[in-house]
């Protein structure tokens, strides 16, 4: 059975993590996609694979995802990036690691190179979605929708069923 834990991001804000520490010199860090969590097939498979091969494994649920603190609609790329950075600093410290990112997780993984370029030994992007906000959303908004975004600092998109 998989054992999830929590780490305090701030005084009253907990992030749910999956940390399989096997005393390896390498850690595989899995970063999930938008509106996903650590209970999907990819993170659970990678965790089992790492255990079988005696490699450390780490994953987390960003704010507003899974069972971590906060509401999804209050999340931003910057907040989620900082969640990842915090957990890596707290758990992995100065050790080497490999990032596996799925969709949004690949984008967040790429951003980690700005802070951990000497520690990251590899990167695997699965269905990588860097800058999906610009191409898939922003460019399709009408001018009045963009104006509303700048005035209110957010714009509520109609759901496409996802």
Residue map of PLM features:
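N-terminal cap/lid segment of alpha/beta-hydrolase-fold proteins
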Residues: 1-23
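Short beta-strand element of the alpha/beta-hydrolase
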Residues: 25-33
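Short substrate-entry loop that stabilizes the transition state in hydrolases
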Residues: 35-41
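Conserved alpha/beta-hydrolase
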Residues: 43, 47-69
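Catalytic nucleophile-loop/oxyanion-hole region of alpha/beta-hydrolase
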Residues: 66-91
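Short beta-strand immediately N-terminal to the catalytic nucleophile in serine-hydrolase-like folds
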Residues: 99-101, 126
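Gly/Ala-rich beta-loop-alpha elbow adjacent to hydrolase catalytic centers
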Residues: 101-109
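The alpha/beta-hydrolase serine catalytic core
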Residues: 107, 119-162
């Amino acid at each position: 059975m998989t054992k999830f834990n929590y780490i305090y991001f701030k005084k009253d804000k907990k992030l749910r993590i999956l940390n399989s520490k096997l005393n390896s010199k390498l850690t595989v860090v899995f970063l999930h996609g938008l509106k996903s969590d650590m209970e999907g097939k990819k993170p659970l498979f990678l965790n089992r694979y790492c255990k079988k091969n005696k490699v450390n494994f780490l994953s987390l649920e960003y704010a507003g995802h899974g069972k971590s603190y906060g509401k999804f609609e209050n999340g931003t790329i910057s907040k989620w990036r900082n969640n990842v950075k915090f957990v890596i600093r707290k758990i992995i410290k100065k050790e080497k690691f490999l990032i596996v990112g799925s969709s949004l997780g690949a984008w967040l993984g790429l951003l980690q190179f700005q802070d951990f370029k000497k520690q990251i030994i590899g990167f695997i992007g699965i269905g990588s979605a860097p800058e999906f906000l610009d191409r898939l959303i922003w460019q399709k908004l009408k001018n009045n929708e963009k104006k509303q975004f700048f005035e209110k600092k957010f714009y509520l998109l109609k759901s496409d069923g996802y």
